[in-house]
Amino acid sequence: MASVPSRSALAFILLLISPVPLAQPLWAQTLLAQAALPREPYGQFLRVKVNTGERSRLTVKKNWLGKRRLNPTVPILVLAGHADSQRMGGAGTSGYAVAVKGAPPMQPGMTDEAFWNLKTAHRIAKLGRQRGLNIRFYDPGVRTIRNADDPRTNWSTGRRHVQAGGYALEIHYDAYGRDGIGSGVIPRVYGGQTVVDEHLAKEFGSFPYDFRGVLGAPRRGITMLEVGKLEGDLENKLRNPATRDGALNTLADRVVHTIAQALGVPKPFFQVPALPALPANRATARQQPSPPPRIPLPPVIN
């Protein structure tokens, strides 16, 4: 009767024939770790060139200066303008394509502005988190809330957020044609203007803080951003399924990049571990990683 190999010998044999080694030298572990790390954690998304049109013609009447600094980790709340005011006054612009060209709305029962406000605000929050911002998106979930003081509205939610020390930004698209003024920031009034407001104004343009006698959102501490008039290249790139995703990325990235600069948030990166130091070898012109240690042969089994 043949002798049965010991447990240690069997374990050693299994280790040798295993396709996945249970232990690897340090240099191999490091190379595998490097290969698993993404080369660029932010910015690897589709973009298309988007012309947001003219900047606010009221930029020359800017009567405010955003100087209040915010902590780089300040909680940021992104809101979609008119998301809670559909089928009522103040539902937002229909856009040139629907109002003038007779195109069907992007979603029945909702103005195109509200539709794009939702898409853009959501994308800003998504890319903002990738960029390292402490940011989230709020959707009231109910498209018609007639009581402005209802706790579910943008205004009520944004006000609570600001009172708790956060920063709130409501996304809008301006009216087309002569009714529109252009892209720009309508800064918050409650709480005072911040460096984020100032940076956004430099990027997009600005409105006076008391535009139309101080609007409801700024009065509650919520900054409003008009991305641009809902017409021309901007509207076309958003409506075209072939360019829509890239257009949303491009617009959202402009906002995210501007906020990150204002807050001084460094671009996130993944630290690539360095290879272990190798002893100097003057005999060779180029250093190579040490080969894996030789594994002794298993004991002979009688």
Give, region by region, the residue ranges found by the protein language model:
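Catalytic-site microenvironment of enzymes
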Residues: A2-P21, P25-N302
